[in-house]
């Protein structure tokens, strides 16, 4: 089980992991309504190395990416939930729309993305040049069919959105 850390704390942890020869994996996202697809994705990310760091979009960046009605859960709640997962070693907040700055600072050996970004027909990966510049690798993690936060929200809205 991990913990929520500041960037300064993560810098110290990264130095320790380097000394120990541990392979650091990074993934990032909004993780607004945590679901089994997120869990399986994070478990697959952890399997790519020794230490999993999750970059969590802060509330302002989630609003910029997903719209004014999001996030449903606050950054503090989302971070605590992620840190409570056995496969997650550290959670750090970031505010940029893409993780280039975070990746350039942490320099993880592996950057994990969803398979929807995989070439040749995947979405663009703006941070690919950053990862290549420090010698990291990008791994594509299969998505879990039928599991998404947007799908969950649509299901709730379709059910009338009433409290349960």
Predicted feature residues:
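Nucleotidyltransferase catalytic core that binds NTPs
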Residues: 1-164
């Amino acid at each position: 089980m991990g913990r929520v850390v500041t960037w300064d704390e993560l810098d110290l942890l990264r130095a320790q992991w380097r000394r120990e020869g541990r392979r650091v994996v990074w993934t990032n996202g909004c993780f607004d309504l945590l679901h089994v697809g997120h869990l399986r994705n994070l478990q697959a990310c952890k399997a790519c190395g020794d230490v999993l760091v999750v970059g969590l979009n802060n509330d302002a960046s989630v609003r910029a990416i997903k719209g004014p009605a999001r996030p449903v859960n606050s950054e503090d709640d989302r971070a605590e939930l992620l840190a409570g997962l056995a496969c997650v070693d550290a959670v750090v907040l970031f505010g940029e729309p893409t993780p280039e700055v975070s990746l350039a600072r942490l320099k993880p050996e592996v950057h994990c993305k969803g398979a929807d970004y995989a070439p040749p027909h995947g979405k663009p990966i703006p941070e690919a040049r950053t990862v290549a510049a420090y010698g990291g690798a990008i791994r594509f993690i299969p998505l879990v069919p039928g599991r998404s936060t947007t799908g969950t929200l649509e299901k709730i809205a379709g059910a009338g959105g009433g409290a349960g």
